[in-house]
Structure formats: structure tokens, C-alpha cells
Amino acid sequence: SKQLLELWDNVRKMQDDILDRLQAGEYSAPLDPSVLKPAEDNEIILCLNYGGLYGINNINHFMQENNNEKEIRRGIQRYKVGDPILFNDSADLFFITDKSQIPIIHNNMKGKIVDFLLLDSGEITERIQFDIAIDRPLMNIDNEKVNFEVIGYTEKGNSIIRFEVFKNRSTDEDDENISKSLVPFQIAYAVSIHKAQGLEYDSVKIIITDDIDELITHSIFYTAITRARK
């Protein structure tokens, strides 16, 4: 929006009326539990810290608790249909068949859990089959060169991919390869401002508590607010 662009420009130039613009444009509000109620489907909460009541870990736990869709557990972790995710560092190698390849599914790529299925329960080959909607369409994929398959598309035309994560590490894997027993993504209702660099969302909520307000530099704040499209 025009107001949002003006705010970005205001912050970038470090003008004196930044606080006035934040308050007048209804871009700021006192911190209370209402911040945890999603305003948009494509929304993220950005934090500077992991611990504490309004830290990343607690917010992710709370918001996943409020997701009433079906779930599956893997150790201490659990995953629910509808959970937003970010692919992590292991994704860069998890989905390729040759280290010389440029990964198509990579670290810091957005997605959402569409479905999952437990296969071979109780067997040495036990694994979870995940269906993940990613944030872009994939075309002309050579299935022999990737460790996933495109199984469909969302209403917006983005791809839904399917892959499997094994419970046990294969004896065929060596230490140089990413284990197919590592889940290549993390739950991401909330992420760090640093992690959000390069990402965009329709709605962004930035948590600034008294404990960390002095740590929010101009650069960090500008990075955070420019993640929002709307």
C-alpha cells in the first residue's frame, strides 16, 4: 500500500517522525495475546529472541496448539496439517541426488503442511510421507534427479511436493550426505528477524518487548517491516 511504502521510506531515511507515523497509521499496538490471532493466511510473527513468553519457541508452540487439524508426532516434535514451515539447512542436500546440483528446494524456502502419512509403522523402514505446498510453481522437474515428486498444485498455482523422512538412518548413508532421517524443515508461525531476510508475507507482526527493545537497531527494524506486502 502507499502508506506502507511511505513508512518504509521514512524508516530508511531515519526521519524524526517515525514513531508518529507508526502510531498514526495503526502500525503499532500494545503487546497482548491478541497478537497471536492471525489476521491473514500468509502471515508471520517476527521476534529477536527465542526464549521468554513472546519468544519464537513459545509463540510457535502456542499457535500450533491452536491448530486443530490432524497431527503426527516424531520424537518430541509434532506436525499438523496447516502448519506453516520453513525449509532448513539440511534441505539443500536432502532433495538432490548429486552434490553438484543446484537445489530446487532449499534453505529458507516457505511452505505449508498439506498432508502426511505414516508408512511401515513399527518396521525398520518406518517413515513419514509429507505433502508440502511450497510458495512457487515447479515446472519440468526431472524426477530422477530429485528426492521428491510434484503431486499437484494449490489454488494459487503453486506446487505441492511429496517426500519421505525415515525414522532410522540408513546403513547405506555416509557421514558426508544429509541423512534422509532428518526432517528438512521447521515449524514457522514465528521466526527470527534474521531468518526472515529475503522472505515476504502479506502480513507481518513484529514483537518488541521491554527485554529486547534496546537490541532493535535501525537495520533490524527496517529488515523486519519490509517483509510485509500489505
Where are these regions (language model features)?
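Core RecA-like ATPase module of SF1/SF2 helicases and allied nucleic-acid translocases
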Residues: L5-K230
